[in-house]
Regions:
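Extended, loop-rich substrate-binding clefts of extracytoplasmic carbohydrate-active enzymes
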Residues: 3-5, 75, 80-134
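A short, structured loop/turn motif at beta-sheet edges
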Residues: 27-31, 70-75, 102-108, 131-136, ...
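Active-site/ligand-binding surface loops and adjacent short beta/alpha elements
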Residues: 79, 151-152, 160-236
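Glycine-rich active-site loops that engage anionic ligands at enzyme catalytic sites
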Residues: 224-262
Length: 296
């Protein structure tokens, strides 16, 4: 386990378990630690199922490849199924892999995950740099195609944020996927006036929430008056297809900056709305996100 500290912020990272940022805490004026990422007491990261905590990399694509299919309209192949609930591959391979430590200081670390073998053509290198400063955490991502052919790629990060009964989410987007069964896209639609979170409503609805937004402006704000904290999430232009998800009654919410829409690896409607990026051998796809807390 690695620890990073800067000012009032502290993070723990597990390179051996998907390079996960297992916790990010802020020490308040009262000396107490306030969790900025959902991290249940005593929970340890696993590579058996996607971790419902912290924040972690999605690569070489984000979210679902239904039935294990990757098809960008040019190249089609199968990837191993890894979703414990069935139905294909979820979030790629990075979250299940051990990451090498390239460097580590008190407030910064660089990690790398490399895939050089497998039953599918994916061969790549992913680099994740995590930096803390006095006001927040910045995560820089880069994936490089190391295969001998052009292939479709995507990246993303999957933060899990604490959510209370009074938590509000603010996010503006111009469109979203339309889901059929099991989050499989059947089309896309424009959103009037910035979408359902433009007015920063209370997030909790008592039912499952699932959105794959398009045309995001790159900023989301999560405010929880009962804790006195707000979190601002920002992301690069390359990660402007965020997923917002939470099951009914959850004490967390997910806002996942990613480079493509849910199901783009396998679903034509998703691919047409927010496609993967086709990388030539040696070409890279980069992105960044930042999580910044403040008192309210």
């Amino acid at each position: 386990m690695l620890e990073l500290e800067a000012g009032h912020l502290r993070a723990t990272i597990h390179p051996e378990a998907g390079g996960i940022i297992a916790s990010l805490d802020r020490r308040g004026p009262d000396g107490r630690l306030h969790k900025l990422l959902h991290a249940p007491d005593g929970a340890m990261p696993s590579t058996a199922a996607p971790n419902m905590m912290g924040s972690w990399v999605m690569a070489p694509f984000a979210n679902r490849a239904f039935d294990g299919v990757v098809d960008d309209g040019v190249t089609r192949f199968l990837v191993p199924e890894n979703n414990p609930r069935g139905g294909g591959n979820i979030h790629g391979f990075g979250w299940q892999s051990a990451w090498a430590i390239l460097g580590h200081t008190g407030s910064h670390t660089a990690l790398e995950h490399r895939r050089s073998a497998g039953p599918d053509p994916y061969r790549y290198r992913v680099r994740q740099e995590i930096s803390l400063d006095d006001s927040g955490m910045t995560i820089a991502l880069s994936i490089t195609n190391e295969a001998d052919q052009a292939l479709p790629y995507g990246i993303g990060h999957h933060p899990w944020f604490p959510c209370a009964a009074d938590t509000r989410l603010g996010l503006t987007a111009s469109g979203a996927l339309v889901f059929g069964e099991a989050f499989r896209a059947i089309g896309s639609e424009p959103l009037a006036e910035g979408g359902p979170y433009a007015g920063k409503p209370v997030f909790a609805t008592g039912r499952e929430t699932a959105w794959s937004f398009l045309g995001w402006d790159g900023t989301a704000r999560i405010e929880t008056p009962s804790t006195g904290l707000a979190i601002t999430l920002t992301a690069s232009e390359s990660l402007r297809c965020p997923v917002v998800w939470a099951p009914a009654g959850a004490d967390f919410l997910c806002v996942e900056p990613q480079s493509h829409a849910i199901g783009s690896p396998s679903e034509k409607a998703a691919r047409e709305a927010g496609p993967l990026r086709r990388l030539q051998p040696g070409e890279s796809l980069d992105g960044w996100l930042r999580i910044a807390p403040e008192a309210i």
